[in-house]
C-alpha cells in the first residue's frame, strides 16, 4: 500500500510539473490584442472606494502602467513593495493596479502598501476580466507600460524589477 501511495504521489507530482512547464512555454500569440492595437485597452474597474474607473479616467502622466495582480501572489507583493520604495523616482508614472479578487482583498492589499496615500496609484476590481483577457495574462504580476499618448511601449509577463523599469522609462 505504501508503494502505491508513493507511486501515486510521484505520478501526480510529475504531471503537475509537466503541466507547469508546458504552460510556461506557451508563447504569446503575435496577434495578441495588445501587440496589434497599441492603444490602452478599454476597461472598467470598481475601485476599492466604490467608484468606477475606466481608461478614460487615466490622467495625463508621462507614463501609465497597468499591473494585473493577485493580492496573495508573492511576486505581486514584491512588485508593490519595490514600487512604493521607489515612488519618488516614479512620480511621472500613473499606476493602475487591477485584480479580479474581491474588493475586501484588494482593499487590504492596497492599504498594506499605502496606495491610498499615493496620488498616482489606483487599485480596483476588474469585474469583467477584461484586462487579463486583453493581455492574455498567464502569470501575475503582468505589467504593461504606455507612454504619454497612451501608446503601448512594453509588456512584462512576469513583473518587472524597478531598475529595469527605470531604465526603460528613462530612455523612452
Regions found by a protein language model. Give the residues of each.
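Bacterial Sec-dependent N-terminal signal peptides
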Residues: 1-27, 172
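N-terminal "domain-start" segment that seeds a small globular fold
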Residues: 23-56
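Short, small/polar residue-rich loop motifs at catalytic or cofactor-binding pockets
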Residues: 39, 62, 138-140
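Short active-site neighborhood of thiol/selenol oxidoreductases, capturing the structured segment around
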Residues: 54-77, 83
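Structural microenvironment flanking redox-active thiols in thiol-disulfide oxidoreductases
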Residues: 77-114, 128-133
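Thiol-/selenol-based redox modules, centered on thioredoxin-like
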Residues: 89, 139, 145-172
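Short, internal strand/loop/helix patches
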Residues: 113-144
